[in-house]
């Protein structure tokens, strides 16, 4: 059950992102900051949530490989979402949005590793941040 619960945040985040990108720009409320910053922050969250799909030991033994996996997963989802937006009336696909998605996924992966490393250093066991 714990493994399923750890996977839900990434799936829910992807669902919300897909839903929001399915509406026209007029129907999606956006704050007055750059949309690239919104992409970066949202996809960093997605990347962080994807870190929960991998075992804690993998992060501690091969962190660069794990960060690469998370970045590639988020990059693939971001690309599919940008292509999806191309077909939504009033929206468009943007390579710069996708690059912000990829950068966010990378930062989320790094944040997941740093969190795991800190928990290991302070000796917290089974904190729920990543799979055991």
Task: Name every feature range the model reports, one short phrase each.
Residues 1-89, 95-98, 102-132:
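Bulky hydrophobic segments
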